[in-house]
A protein has these predicted regions:
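Acidic, surface-exposed loops and disordered segments
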Residues: 1-197
Length: 197
């Protein structure tokens, strides 16, 4: 099987990580894959903030736990030693999609490197708070940014979970011959010529 297809089919969300730190090279490769994600009109509106500082990582975990409504002490990042925050420029109309595509690329890159990852929500709520906007400024990040997601990434602790069964009935084939009748309402000279071809 093609290696890209293999990665697409085998990647899983991981919910148990080893505490071992990742190298800057590993994280750099993951982020590079994210930077090459497709973006609306080529705007490249998404950015990545790579968090390896334990104090900041734990602060984000505690805030995420509070927003999510879990009991104090629960780690929504499942022990992952590194968190990659994805934010996107609010002034770009496709910023949420751009950030989501960046996340997808990075999840696949982590898998290709033999690492585990998981998408964690609530970045929007966090970065709507003044203190987190202030944190961005501390890091030298200016502008209007919306939190898209956190990528928790690290070495997998335990077995990779089996894939969930795919739900049926999620693909519809709109094949040209079977659509002729359905598009009768729109038939004009151009459509008639198309049908005759």
């Amino acid at each position: 099987m093609n290696e890209v297809m293999k990665a697409l089919l085998e990647r899983r969300s991981i919910r148990k990580f080893k505490p071992d730190a990742l190298t800057k090279e590993q994280l750099g490769q993951i982020v590079e894959a994210g930077l090459y994600a497709a973006s609306g009109k080529g705007a490249q509106s998404a950015i990545a903030v790579v968090v390896t500082n334990k104090a900041l990582r734990d602060r984000l975990s505690a805030e995420n736990c509070r927003i999510g409504g879990w009991e104090e002490g629960f780690d929504p990042f499942y022990g992952a030693p590194a968190i990659i925050l994805v934010l996107a420029n609010k002034n770009e109309p496709n910023h949420v999609y751009d950030g989501s595509l960046m996340m997808g690329n990075m999840m696949l890159a982590a898998h290709a490197l033999g690492l585990g990852s998981i998408w964690i929500n609530r970045a929007k709520q966090e970065f709507d708070m003044p203190e987190y906007q202030a944190l961005l400024k501390e890091l030298g990040i200016e502008g209007e940014w919306e939190g898209i997601a956190h990528l928790a990434v690290g070495y997998i602790d335990g077995e990779v979970p089996a894939p969930a069964e795919r739900k049926p009935g999620r693909v519809y084939w709109a094949e040209y011959p079977s659509l002729k009748k359905g598009f009768a309402l729109f038939q004009g000279e151009g459509f008639a010529a198309l049908c005759a071809s």
